[in-house]
Curated annotation (Swiss-Prot):
DNA-dependent RNA polymerase catalyzes the transcription of DNA into RNA using the four ribonucleoside triphosphates as substrates. SUPFAM superfamilies: beta and beta-prime subunits of DNA dependent RNA-polymerase (SSF64484). GO terms for cellular component: DNA-directed RNA polymerase complex. Binds 1 Mg(2+) ion per subunit. This is DNA-directed RNA polymerase subunit beta'. Belongs to the RNA polymerase beta' chain family. Mg(2+) binds at D450, D452, D454. Its cofactor is Mg(2+); Zn(2+). Keywords: DNA-directed RNA polymerase, Magnesium, Metal-binding, Nucleotidyltransferase, Transcription, Transferase, Zinc. The keyword Zinc applies. NCBIfam families: rpoC_TIGR (TIGR02386).
């Protein structure tokens, strides 16, 4: 057997007849499967033990030899070799076909490989192969054309005319095989290359296609005649099993039926040939044999599929590979695993960040082997069998052992759908009673989990290495930041936010205001005994908190704060400033001086002079967590988060906030606002009836009126709200709900969407406090159903987008430290019109500079070339007034098959420089795909006034960008750099003409009359600039400008869509994806290289091909960059395993086989498929070839490991 972890590459080619014979262990001559009386396989049948091996381990068919000691002996009675039964999964047989048969993949695929090789049309081929026409093979001295078709009648006439034997014409696959044998590859290729020099149009395209196929045969060493089969391999019987069902009936794989048909027809054909049967009967049998083999290889590809019982099409060999249920996606890319469990999740508020609760019964089953080993080691049982009995009986002693076993053994928890890598995290198990898994409340956001019946799967990492990786790399406490934007993903939510919000509220005149305490304990004592309220403003001695970073002027003073804030600050990391105001200045620069009493000052005076601060909201807590992480990294942050969670839950319980109908306020002037809107709508309808506006205009005006009415109510609601109202507190803190929910409770529900996406004109005037009328309720449910269906469709769409993204970028891995490129990317803030969608500061964080950045006024060097830009540095650059910076970018990285560390920058999930081996492609794909469900589905209908196009937004726009489709509402772009000299309107054709004067000439562009212009006369425009509003077609932009412009444009467009929906994604993720779309070039002129014109190839391969030619002084090849959508890019990857497992499996494999493609196993998918460890992370060669050293020889590196000790 090949050692799967040793081989370097994998090749696929056509199998020659001799190769098939060398695989085979014998010929299958009979269509029988098993004897239904004895249930033994029939001799020479499809399950024959002589050919395929014994059905029982170490036992021949007749039973003469049993036991392992006869290993390798071939029984003299039954001829079966004594060996393991599993050889029945490996040994193949064969069928000697009595007539050649064409392979349907090569004849029927698009383009037909057989047709291109022979220069015949697929129609002609079909007529010949299925015995409808003769083809002239050798005209000899007759005037017939080679490869011309003759009908039966014409053939007989020609025979009479020229005499028997004067020419050779045949029909069937045999004829095709003869023609294929006659193809002289070298001569044909030379001839086509000559033809290409002069050909153009259709002729050229066809020549390029033929040249491609012939060249593939020539280079791969495959012979064209192997596309026709003379011998058919039979796959091992255990891969097409036959199992007995309870009722004594049998269930067999469809393949057995298909093989039986082939054998039956083959045997019948052999008999007919022996009997010298009439030609027409033999021909018919040959055609049936051809059809039987077609059905076996790819049933349904030609004609009607062969059906089984209940007219179900049989599953052929091709179907075994294709689709979600095929071999690739079902068994190779994802397998079911042992040592796993699944249960409902419940909340575990008492757990630490790195813990999860595992039910006892589940744990004992999952850790059974470990427990059994310990039982034997402790000599509670003599052997493993007895230990197993002990566990199954539920002996008392096993529970103590289980506690020991799981102590340092992390488990993985996974929630489907796993949209990003935070969907699987490691935890230390804690045994609990009950049957539900307990999950820490803070990791819910990463999993997108809630406790309304969600289920999660649990897995046990078995090997030492797996446990170490789970503990060091996957522990939940390590995953504080979200890989997509580097912001904390573990922000408290709901009750935790509400508790901390309530705790940090301030209130004037509450009991205990103005009291001064010597330390925290005294303040808490006063609060517990009812002398001071949580919200009352009191004084505390600064010296009681010596570890806080006070300014010198603040020490030894009294500080004004609240009892709640004393408690709140008590859980903060010691080195963080005392948080008195919910803003970043307090967090980064320290507590403001105004809260400190000067000696002899009256505390009440100071209190009266201070404004009441707003409490800490969800966003503030997020900022505190981010700052904590930045300063103290993982261990301290996760411990702090647990303290924050406990404090939040505790005080949320004490606060006892509830919601009753009385908490929903009544808006005093609601009737006035609604009457005014009714009045306005009536006026609009009057104007419409008089013909003063179109129906579209009227619709927009009416909906706008109602929208404004709703906004007016909302505004009034905010003005009159009571900050102590529980609903307002929930909304304001960010714990639950937003102003829109609140205004539906207290204002009006507003306009609803109809199922077709159009907004209905009749609004719902009531709110939920008043209750809805029957008609309003109907409209309301109408809109709600639309929402539900949208969500369901969106989820599927978004999932498919993620799959395509992962597929195209799965082989992008950080391969080296620095690629040494001298190119960079000039970046500035991304704007949409006047609006800034992404600031320069955000874009600079965590990137390396390409050139040094200077202060625009003083000329001082702010940061040198090739330096990492930190958050503080980015702020400094922007504050200095710099508007554009040249940075290292994934777009310009010169690393092959991946990216280098400097071009990528920091890893957003850790905040540190990215490590070599990080699978950045997959992370990028997940970061873009995961928020896909949050994007809207709709294409906005602007009511036909503002523009003549529908603006595509949300998910459809993202798909449009990544698939490089022509956008809806395309903008007209200029190909000339110069000035707009004239815009003339032509009423007759309803168009405008824009004239751009450049140095080389005048550009004239026709624009639709209704399009909104982006330029005016006198404006200076660059090549590729949009003249009208709308999206630019990226392929056009690539023709006019260069690759980098297209990449920059696509990056900006993706960011616009996500940022407009409030989703932040790091630029680098989009860069990785966009770069994959522009990896290929098309060869235009091959020069002196041996490339073929029109070939699509990787940029790096093209450069290599040119390098040698340039060195030897030849003419290099020229090429043009090609922009491909992600689906096409995935299929065009260099790895045929990855492409075949993605889509269009048969086409990919057909093509790969003809070319004799080699897969060098560089990506992740290929390695998962063949079962090798993936070449990313710790699976990279550089991390695997490790020499162990004694501990005392090297210094022990202190890793920020979070474990039970962190308590």
């Amino acid at each position: 057997m090949v050692d799967v972890n040793r081989f370097k590459s994998m090749q696929i080619t056509l199998a020659s007849p001799s190769k098939v014979r060398s695989w085979s262990y014998g010929e299958v001559k009979k269509p029988e499967t098993i004897n239904y009386r004895t249930l033994k396989p029939e001799r020479e049948g499809l399950f024959d033990e002589v050919i395929f091996g014994p059905t029982k381990d170490w036992e021949c068919a007749c039973g003469k030899y049993k036991r392992i000691r006869y290993k390798g002996i071939v029984c003299d009675r039954c001829g079966v070799e004594v060996t393991r039964a599993k050889v029945r999964r490996e040994r193949m047989g064969h069928i000697e076909l009595k007539a050649p048969v064409s392979h349907i993949w090569y004849f029927k695929g698009i383009p037909s490989r057989m047709g291109l090789t022979l220069d015949m049309s697929p129609r002609a081929l079909e007529e010949v192969i299925y015995f409808a026409a003769y083809v002239v093979i050798d005209p000899k001295d007759t005037p017939l054309e080679p490869k011309s078709l003759l009908t039966e009648r014409e053939y007989r006439e020609k025979l009479q005319e020229y005499g028997h034997g004067s020419f050779v014409a045949k029909m069937g696959a045999e004829a095709i095989q003869d023609l294929l044998k006659r193809v002289d590859l070298a001569a044909e290729i030379a001839e086509l290359k000559e033809e290409l020099k002069s050909a153009s149009g259709q002729k050229r395209i066809k020549a390029v296609r033929r040249l491609d196929v012939l060249d593939a045969f020539n280079k791969s060493g495959n012979k064209p005649e192997w596309m026709v089969l003379n011998i058919l391999p039979v796959i091992p019987p255990d891969l097409r099993p036959m199992v007995q069902l309870d009722g004594g009936r049998f269930a067999a794989s469809d393949l057995n039926d298909l093989y039986r048909r082939v054998i039956n027809r083959n045997n019948r054909l052999a008999r007919l040939l022996e009997l010298n049967a009439p030609g027409i009967i033999v021909q018919n049998e040959k055609r049936m044999l051809q059809e039987a083999v077609d059905a076996l290889i790819d049933n349904g590809r030609r004609g009607r599929p062969i059906t089984g019982p209940g007219s179900r099409p049989l599953k052929s060999l091709s179907h075994m590979l294709k689709g979600k249920q095929g071999r690739f996606r079902q068994n190779l890319l994802g397998k079911r695993v042992d040592f796993s469990g699944r249960s409902v999740i419940a909340v575990g508020p008492t757990l630490k960040m790195y813990q999860c609760g595992v039910p006892r019964e589940m744990a004992i089953e999952l850790f059974k082997p470990f427990v059994m080993r310990e039982i034997v080691a402790k000599e509670y049982a003599g052997n493993v069998k007895a230990a197993k009995r002990m566990v199954e009986r539920g002996d008392e002693r096993i529970w103590d052992i289980l506690e020991e076993v799981i102590k340092e053994h992390p488990v993985l928890l996974n929630r489907a759908p796993t949209l990003h890598r935070l969907g699987i995290q490691a935890f230390e198990p804690v045994l609990i009673d009950g049957k539900a898994l307990r999950l820490h409340p803070l990791v819910c956001e990463a999993y997108n989990a809630d406790f309304d019946g969600d289920q999660m799967a649990i897995h046990v990492p078995l090997s030492e290495e797996a446990q170490a990786e789970a503990r060091l790399l996957m522990l939940a406490a390590e995953h504080i930041l979200n890989p997509k934007d580097g912001k904390p993903v573990v922000t408290p939510s709901q009750d935790m936010v509400l508790g901390n919000y309530y705790l940090t509220m301030e209130d004037a005149g509450r009991e205990g205001e103005g009291m001064i305490f010597k330390d925290k304990d005294e303040a808490v004592m006063a609060y517990r005994n009812g002398y001071a309220h949580l919200h009352s403003r009191v004084g505390i001695a600064v010296d009681s908190m010596p570890n806080k970073p006070w300014k010198d002027s603040q020490r030894h003073k009294i500080m004004v704060t609240t009892v709640g804030k004393i408690l709140f600050n008590d859980i903060m990391p010691e080195d963080l400033p005392y948080l008195q105001e919910p803003n970043n200045a307090n967090l980064t620069e320290g507590t403001p001086d105004k809260y400190f009493l000067e000696p002899g000052q009256d505390i009440q005076e100071v209190i009266d002079g201070l404004d009441i601060n707003v409490p800490f909201k969800k966003k503030n807590l997020g900022n505190i967590i981010a700052e904590t992480f930045k300063r103290f990294r993982t261990t301290e942050t996760s411990a702090f988060l647990d303290r924050l969670k406990d404090l939040g839950y505790y005080h949320s319980t004490l606060a006892g906030l509830t919601v009753g109908i009385a908490d929903i306020p009544v808006i005093d002037n609601k009737a006035e606002i609604i009457d005014a809107a009714h009045h306005r709508v009536e006026e609009i309808n009057k104007a419409f009836r008089r013909g003063l506006m179109t129906d579209d205009d009227r619709y927009v005006a009416v909906t706008t009126t109602w929208r404004e009415a709703k906004e007016a109510l909302e505004k009034r609601l905010i003005e009159t709200q009571d900050p102590k109202n529980p609903i307002v507190m929930m909304m304001d803190s960010g714990a639950r709900g937003n102003i829109s929910n609140f205004s539906q409770l207290a204002g009006m529900r507003g306009l609803m969407a109809a199922p077709n996406g159009r907004i209905m004109e009749l609004p719902i005037l009531s709110n939920f406090r008043e209750g809805l009328s029957v008609l309003e309720m109907f409209f309301s449910t109408h809109g709600a159903r639309k929402g539900m269906t949208d969500t369901a469709l969106k989820t599927a769409d978004s999932g498919y987008l993620t799959r395509r993204l992962v597929d195209v970028a799965q082989d992008v891995i950080i391969r080296e430290d620095d690629c040494g490129t001298d190119r960079g990317l000039l970046i500035r803030a991304i704007t949409d019109g006047k609006e800034v969608t992404e600031t320069l500061e955000v874009r600079l964080q965590g990137r390396y500079t390409r050139k040094s950045v200077k202060h625009p006024e003083t000329g001082e060097v702010l940061i040198g070339a090739d330096q990492l830009i930190t958050e503080d540095m980015a702020r400094k650059i922007v504050d200095a007034g710099v508007e554009e910076v040249t940075i290292r970018s994934v777009f310009t990285c010169a690393t092959r098959h991946g990216v280098c560390r400097h071009c990528y920058g920091i890893n957003l999930a850790t905040g540190d420089a990215v490590e070599v081996g990080e699978a950045v492609g997959t992370i990028a794909a997940q970061s873009i795909g995961e928020p896909g469900t949050q994007l809207t589905m709709r294409t906005f209908h602007t009511g036909g006034v503002a523009s003549n196009t529908d603006i595509t937004q949300g998910l459809p726009r993202i798909q449009e960008i990544f698939e490089a489709r022509n956008p809806k509402g395309e903008a007209v772009i200029t190909e000339v750099k110069g000035n707009v000299v004239e815009i003339e309107e032509d009423a007759s054709t309803r168009t405008k003409k824009v004239y751009v004067q450049g140095k080389t000439g005048m550009g004239e562009y026709v624009v639709p009359f209704t399009a909104r212009m982006k330029v005016e006369v006198g404006d200076e425009v660059n090549r590729g600039a949009a003249l009208t509003e709308g999206s630019i077609q990226p392929k056009r932009l690539l023709e006019v400008r260069d690759t980098l412009s297209v990449e920059t444009y696509l990056l900006a467009e993706v960011q616009k869509v996500y940022r407009s929906q409030g989703v932040e994604i790091g630029d680098k993720h989009v860069e990785v994806m966009v770069r994959q779309m522009l990896r290929k070039v098309r060869v235009m002129d091959p020069g002196d290289t041996d490339l073929l014109p029109g070939t699509l190839m990787d940029i790096s391969d093209f450069t290599d091909a040119n390098k040698d030619i340039v060195i030897s002084g030849g003419i290099p090849a020229t090429s043009r960059p090609v922009l491909m959508g992600i689906t096409k890019a995935s299929l065009e990857t260099n790895s045929f395993l990855s492409a075949a497992s993605f889509q269009e499996t048969t086409r990919v494999l057909t093509d790969a086989a003809i070319r004799g493609k080699k897969d060098h196993l560089l990506g992740l998918k290929e390695n998962v498929i063949i079962g090798k460890i993936i070449p990313a992370g710790t699976g990279m060669a550089r991390y695997r070839n490790i020499e162990p050293q004694a501990m005392n020889e090297i210094e022990v590196i202190d890793h920020t490991e979070v474990s039970a000790e962190a308590e």
